[in-house]
């Protein structure tokens, strides 16, 4: 029996590998394992809660330097005194807002996710880009197409 979904997942894993995007490669391979085992019963939960869990893990990793003391509080306070840091804060606020629009768009139009993934992988492979978050890319798409 020919499974086109499995073929697509394998192609995405291959693109991730070729483009040195280990996050895509590992993610797709994990999804293949889930798909081909009894763990597939977890797909509804992953589809519903996956982005939230991922954002929580990402937030933990971003805040870890503050919690560990690697980023001293004095550095945080100085961020409000330097114009470059203030620009970084403004960009951070904008990107967070954009990511929120991306989450909404990906939830309302899941077909866009494949395009974002392929675009990210191609950008990494062909233009030596770095795999930026698909949430931000989805946010930009939402601004361009006027959705969410």
Curated annotation (Swiss-Prot):
<dbReference type="GO" id="GO:0005886">
    <property type="term" value="C:plasma membrane"/>
</dbReference>
<keyword id="KW-0812">Transmembrane</keyword>
<dbReference type="InterPro" id="IPR007382">
    <property type="entry name" value="UPF0756_TM"/>
</dbReference>
<protein>
    <recommendedName>
        <fullName>UPF0756 membrane protein ESA_02180</fullName>
    </recommendedName>
</protein>
<feature type="transmembrane region" description="Helical">
    <location>
        <begin position="86"/>
        <end position="106"/>
    </location>
</feature>
<feature type="transmembrane region" description="Helical">
    <location>
        <begin position="4"/>
        <end position="24"/>
    </location>
</feature>
<keyword id="KW-1003">Cell membrane</keyword>
<feature type="transmembrane region" description="Helical">
    <location>
        <begin position="112"/>
        <end position="132"/>
    </location>
</feature>
<dbReference type="Pfam" id="PF04284">
    <property type="entry name" value="DUF441"/>
</dbReference>
<keyword id="KW-0472">Membrane</keyword>
<feature type="transmembrane region" description="Helical">
    <location>
        <begin position="51"/>
        <end position="71"/>
    </location>
</feature>
<comment type="similarity">
    <text>Belongs to the UPF0756 family.</text>
</comment>
<keyword id="KW-1133">Transmembrane helix</keyword>
């Amino acid at each position: 029996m020919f499974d086109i979904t499995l073929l697509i997942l394998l192609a995405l894993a291959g693109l991730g590998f070729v483009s040195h995007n280990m996050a895509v490669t590992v993610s797709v391979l994990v999804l293949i394992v889930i798909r081909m085992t009894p763990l597939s019963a977890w797909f509804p939960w992953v589809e519903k809660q996956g982005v939230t869990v991922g954002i929580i893990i990402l937030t933990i990793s971003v805040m870890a330097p503050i919690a560990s003391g690697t980023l001293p509080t004095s550095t945080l306070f100085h961020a409000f005194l330097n114009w470059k840091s203030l620009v970084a804060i403004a960009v951070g606020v904008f990107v967070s807002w954009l990511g929120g629009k991306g989450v909404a768009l990906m939830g309302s139009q899941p077909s866009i996710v494949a395009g974002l993934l392929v675009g990210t992988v191609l950008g990494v492979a062909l233009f030596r880009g770095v795999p930026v978050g698909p949430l931000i890319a989805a946010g930009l798409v939402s601004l361009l197409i006027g959705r969410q």
